[in-house]
Regions:
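Cleft-lining beta-strand/loop regions that shape enzyme active-site pockets
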Residues: 1-125
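Residues in well-ordered beta-strands of folded domains
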Residues: 3, 59-60, 136, 158-160
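Conserved functional hotspot residues or short segments at active or partner-binding sites
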Residues: 148-150, 154-176
Length: 176
Protein backbone atom coordinates (compact mmCIF):
# COMPACT_ATOMS: atom_id res chain seq x y z
CA UNK A 1 0.00 0.00 0.00
CA UNK A 2 1.43 3.38 -1.05
CA UNK A 3 -0.39 6.64 -0.30
CA UNK A 4 0.48 9.64 -2.50
CA UNK A 5 -0.91 12.91 -1.15
CA UNK A 6 0.51 15.14 -3.92
CA UNK A 7 2.91 14.95 -6.85
CA UNK A 8 5.99 17.02 -6.06
CA UNK A 9 9.67 17.00 -7.06
CA UNK A 10 10.59 14.22 -4.62
CA UNK A 11 7.43 12.08 -5.02
CA UNK A 12 8.77 9.69 -7.68
CA UNK A 13 11.90 8.88 -5.66
CA UNK A 14 9.78 8.35 -2.53
CA UNK A 15 7.43 6.08 -4.50
CA UNK A 16 10.33 4.00 -5.83
CA UNK A 17 11.76 3.65 -2.32
CA UNK A 18 8.39 2.61 -0.88
CA UNK A 19 7.86 0.02 -3.62
CA UNK A 20 11.36 -1.39 -3.11
CA UNK A 21 10.65 -1.71 0.63
CA UNK A 22 7.39 -3.53 -0.15
CA UNK A 23 9.17 -5.83 -2.61
CA UNK A 24 11.75 -6.64 0.07
CA UNK A 25 8.81 -7.65 2.31
CA UNK A 26 7.44 -10.02 -0.36
CA UNK A 27 4.84 -7.80 -2.03
CA UNK A 28 2.40 -9.75 -4.22
CA UNK A 29 0.21 -6.81 -5.29
CA UNK A 30 0.24 -3.02 -5.04
CA UNK A 31 -2.43 -0.55 -3.94
CA UNK A 32 -1.78 3.11 -4.78
CA UNK A 33 -4.01 5.55 -2.90
CA UNK A 34 -4.54 8.94 -4.56
CA UNK A 35 -7.76 9.80 -2.73
CA UNK A 36 -7.81 13.44 -1.62
CA UNK A 37 -4.75 14.12 -3.82
CA UNK A 38 -5.27 17.47 -5.62
CA UNK A 39 -2.48 16.80 -8.14
CA UNK A 40 0.83 18.54 -8.56
CA UNK A 41 3.62 18.32 -11.08
CA UNK A 42 2.99 16.50 -14.36
CA UNK A 43 6.64 15.44 -14.49
CA UNK A 44 6.33 13.72 -11.10
CA UNK A 45 3.34 11.60 -12.07
CA UNK A 46 4.95 10.75 -15.43
CA UNK A 47 8.05 9.48 -13.56
CA UNK A 48 5.85 7.23 -11.43
CA UNK A 49 3.95 5.97 -14.47
CA UNK A 50 7.32 5.17 -16.05
CA UNK A 51 7.83 2.73 -13.15
CA UNK A 52 4.35 1.22 -13.50
CA UNK A 53 3.42 1.00 -17.18
CA UNK A 54 4.90 -0.58 -20.27
CA UNK A 55 6.35 1.61 -23.02
CA UNK A 56 3.98 4.18 -24.53
CA UNK A 57 2.22 7.50 -24.08
CA UNK A 58 0.89 8.00 -20.52
CA UNK A 59 -0.69 11.43 -21.11
CA UNK A 60 -0.59 14.15 -23.71
CA UNK A 61 -1.37 17.85 -23.71
CA UNK A 62 -2.66 20.20 -26.38
CA UNK A 63 -2.37 23.97 -26.26
CA UNK A 64 -4.86 26.43 -27.78
CA UNK A 65 -3.13 26.13 -31.15
CA UNK A 66 -3.46 22.35 -31.17
CA UNK A 67 0.24 21.73 -30.50
CA UNK A 68 0.53 18.30 -28.90
CA UNK A 69 3.12 17.20 -26.35
CA UNK A 70 3.32 13.51 -25.46
CA UNK A 71 4.63 12.27 -22.12
CA UNK A 72 5.79 8.67 -22.33
CA UNK A 73 6.88 5.69 -20.31
CA UNK A 74 10.09 3.97 -21.32
CA UNK A 75 8.72 0.66 -20.07
CA UNK A 76 12.06 -0.52 -18.72
CA UNK A 77 11.06 -0.80 -15.07
CA UNK A 78 7.33 -1.47 -15.14
CA UNK A 79 5.88 -3.36 -12.20
CA UNK A 80 4.70 -6.90 -12.71
CA UNK A 81 2.15 -7.03 -9.88
CA UNK A 82 -1.63 -6.78 -9.73
CA UNK A 83 -2.44 -3.10 -9.20
CA UNK A 84 -5.37 -1.27 -7.60
CA UNK A 85 -5.66 2.53 -7.53
CA UNK A 86 -7.93 4.14 -4.93
CA UNK A 87 -9.67 7.32 -6.19
CA UNK A 88 -12.42 9.70 -5.14
CA UNK A 89 -13.98 13.05 -6.01
CA UNK A 90 -10.99 14.83 -4.48
CA UNK A 91 -8.50 13.04 -6.76
CA UNK A 92 -7.65 15.71 -9.32
CA UNK A 93 -5.20 16.75 -12.01
CA UNK A 94 -2.01 14.65 -11.76
CA UNK A 95 -3.94 12.03 -9.76
CA UNK A 96 -6.28 11.73 -12.72
CA UNK A 97 -3.32 11.41 -15.08
CA UNK A 98 -2.23 8.36 -13.07
CA UNK A 99 -5.75 6.91 -12.90
CA UNK A 100 -6.44 7.61 -16.59
CA UNK A 101 -3.25 5.94 -17.77
CA UNK A 102 -3.79 2.87 -15.58
CA UNK A 103 -7.37 2.61 -16.85
CA UNK A 104 -6.53 3.14 -20.53
CA UNK A 105 -3.74 0.55 -20.42
CA UNK A 106 -6.04 -1.79 -18.43
CA UNK A 107 -3.07 -2.33 -16.17
CA UNK A 108 -4.94 -2.12 -12.88
CA UNK A 109 -8.32 -1.63 -11.25
CA UNK A 110 -9.65 1.78 -10.19
CA UNK A 111 -11.62 1.55 -6.95
CA UNK A 112 -13.66 4.31 -5.30
CA UNK A 113 -15.76 7.12 -6.75
CA UNK A 114 -15.50 9.30 -9.87
CA UNK A 115 -12.55 11.70 -9.79
CA UNK A 116 -12.77 15.50 -9.74
CA UNK A 117 -12.40 16.16 -13.49
CA UNK A 118 -9.52 18.63 -13.81
CA UNK A 119 -8.20 18.02 -17.30
CA UNK A 120 -6.30 21.27 -17.72
CA UNK A 121 -2.71 22.38 -17.28
CA UNK A 122 -2.19 25.61 -15.40
CA UNK A 123 1.03 27.60 -15.41
CA UNK A 124 2.07 30.24 -12.88
CA UNK A 125 3.65 33.34 -14.39
CA UNK A 126 5.50 35.60 -11.90
CA UNK A 127 5.03 39.35 -12.27
CA UNK A 128 7.70 42.00 -11.74
CA UNK A 129 5.99 43.31 -8.59
CA UNK A 130 6.22 39.89 -6.90
CA UNK A 131 2.65 38.85 -7.62
CA UNK A 132 1.85 36.01 -9.97
CA UNK A 133 -0.89 35.03 -12.35
CA UNK A 134 -2.07 31.46 -12.97
CA UNK A 135 -3.31 30.77 -16.49
CA UNK A 136 -4.70 27.69 -18.17
CA UNK A 137 -2.16 26.87 -20.87
CA UNK A 138 -3.26 23.46 -22.19
CA UNK A 139 -5.73 20.60 -21.94
CA UNK A 140 -4.57 17.11 -21.11
CA UNK A 141 -5.84 13.83 -22.49
CA UNK A 142 -5.53 10.22 -21.37
CA UNK A 143 -3.50 7.86 -23.59
CA UNK A 144 -6.68 6.91 -25.50
CA UNK A 145 -7.55 10.58 -26.08
CA UNK A 146 -10.19 11.04 -23.37
CA UNK A 147 -10.65 14.63 -22.18
CA UNK A 148 -11.84 14.36 -18.59
CA UNK A 149 -12.28 18.04 -17.66
CA UNK A 150 -15.58 18.52 -15.85
CA UNK A 151 -16.33 14.80 -16.18
CA UNK A 152 -13.72 12.92 -14.17
CA UNK A 153 -12.65 9.31 -14.43
CA UNK A 154 -15.07 6.61 -13.35
CA UNK A 155 -13.80 3.76 -11.19
CA UNK A 156 -13.96 0.15 -12.35
CA UNK A 157 -15.40 -0.74 -8.95
CA UNK A 158 -17.49 1.94 -7.26
CA UNK A 159 -17.22 2.05 -3.47
CA UNK A 160 -18.21 4.92 -1.23
CA UNK A 161 -15.67 6.49 1.14
CA UNK A 162 -16.62 4.67 4.33
CA UNK A 163 -15.64 1.37 2.70
CA UNK A 164 -12.25 2.73 1.71
CA UNK A 165 -10.69 3.75 5.00
CA UNK A 166 -7.03 3.69 3.99
CA UNK A 167 -6.03 2.02 7.24
CA UNK A 168 -8.47 -0.86 6.69
CA UNK A 169 -7.93 -1.68 3.03
CA UNK A 170 -6.00 -4.78 2.08
CA UNK A 171 -5.43 -6.18 -1.39
CA UNK A 172 -7.91 -9.02 -0.81
CA UNK A 173 -10.58 -6.60 0.43
CA UNK A 174 -10.04 -4.36 -2.60
CA UNK A 175 -10.76 -7.23 -4.97
CA UNK A 176 -13.63 -8.84 -3.01
Amino acid sequence: YVHIDSFETETAAQFEEAVKDLEDQGMKALIIDVRYNPGGMVTAVVQILDDILPEGTVVYTEDKNGNRQDYTSGGDTYLDYPLAVLINGESASASEILAGAVKDYQYGTLIGTTTFGKGIVQTIFPLENGDAVKLTTAKYFTPKGNYIHGVGIEPDIELEYEYLDKEAVSYDEAYD
